[in-house]
Regions:
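A conserved acidic, glycine/proline-rich C-terminal tail/linker
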Residues: 76-79
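Short gly/pro-enriched beta-turn/loop segments at secondary-structure junctions
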Residues: 14-16, 26-30, 34-39, 85
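Hydrophobic residue at the +6 position relative to the catalytic HRD Asp in the kinase catalytic loop
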Residues: 90-92
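Active-site nucleotide/adenylate-binding loops and adjacent lid/helix of ATP-dependent enzymes
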Residues: 1-28, 70, 74
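Beta-strand scaffold of nucleotide-dependent catalytic cores
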Residues: 22, 31-47, 100-105
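Glycine-rich, positively charged active-site loop/lid region within alpha/beta enzyme cores that binds
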Residues: 39-64
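Short, hinge-like loop/turn segments at secondary-structure boundaries
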Residues: 3-6, 38-39, 107
Length: 147
């Protein structure tokens, strides 16, 4: 949803409990970089349709596998490792040589994998099998236990 003035912004705020807001960047494409385990397994450009600011394939964008910047792949690798992410699709834009991570999400679209013969489910399963301990362990508790 593109907001172009204060009136539209107020209307958006009045009708949405949760706001997802980002600056509109001067781009006609962004990258989807898929990370599983401890590596990038796929990457591609999502190029917006004519007269659209949206690049996602589900809303008319097209896919290109040409010339994905190595710096963007390295950025995803670094961020994923620093944050302990082992499965996500990263959406990244490049503006004037700077990279902007819009989001990373475990529920990412995979249409860009169809032409690459990448079987995501097999890669995820292989990673999980390598990570599975041979003996049962206690589940990780992210918050202190309250007695």
């Amino acid at each position: 949803y593109l907001i172009e003035d204060k009136k539209q912004f107020r209307s958006y705020c009045d009708t949405n409990e949760i706001l997802y807001i980002q600056e509109k960047l001067p781009i006609d494409r962004d990258m989807r970089i898929i990370y599983v385990g401890d590596e990038v397994i796929a990457s591609y450009w999502r190029i917006g349709g004519e007269n659209s600011f949206k690049n996602n394939v589900a809303q008319g964008g097209v896919i290109s596998y040409d010339n994905i910047p190595q710096d963007a792949l390295a950025l995803v690798d670094k961020v994923a490792k620093e944050l302990g992410i082992n499965h996500a699709g990263f959406d990244i834009a490049e503006v004037d040589g700077h990279y902007y991570i819009f989001e990373f999400n475990v529920f990412f679209g995979t249409r860009g994998l169809l032409n690459q013969s990448i079987k995501l489910h097999e890669i995820i399963l292989s990673y999980l099998q390598k990570q599975t301990p041979s003996i049962p362990t206690d589940p990780y508790t992210p918050f202190p236990k309250v007695s």
